[in-house]
């Protein structure tokens, strides 16, 4: 799957345990968020970041992130912060 500059991938808790990622959302070119339950991911291709960090990189993502959290509990509330998963390519 190709990632574009504003893509965000969000996964289940399994990534924190170093296991394979089983649930991924991503932003497609037409602006629709899609869910791929059968897509395989490698943990090394993704990066755990604080939500405030990703919002600081692209403030337009704030509304999208908040809507996604209402749809499904795809975020981590960990260590008193909210976290999401993004591709390494987004932060390079």
Can you name each region flagged by the protein language model?
Residues 58-92:
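Short, compact, well-ordered microdomains
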Residues 18-19:
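Glycine-centered positions within short beta-strands or beta-hairpins
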Residues 22-23, 35, 84-85:
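A sequence-level detector of short linear motifs
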Residues 11-14, 27-69:
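Acidic, aromatic-enriched beta-alpha/helix-loop junctions
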Residues 1-12:
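Negatively charged, low-complexity tracts enriched in Asp/Glu with abundant Ser/Thr
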Residues 22-27, 74-76:
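Broad, structure-driven detector of short, well-ordered beta-strand segments within folded domains
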């Amino acid at each position: 799957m190709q990632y574009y500059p504003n893509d965000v991938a969000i996964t289940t808790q399994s990534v924190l345990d170093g296991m394979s990622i089983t649930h991924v959302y991503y932003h497609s070119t037409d602006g629709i968020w899609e869910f791929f339950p059968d897509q395989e991911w490698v943990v090394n291709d993704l990066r755990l970041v604080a939500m405030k960090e990703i919002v600081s990189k692209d403030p337009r993502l704030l509304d999208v992130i908040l809507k996604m959290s209402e749809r499904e509990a795809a975020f981590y509330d960990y260590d008193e912060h909210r976290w999401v998963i993004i591709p390494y390519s987004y932060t390079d």
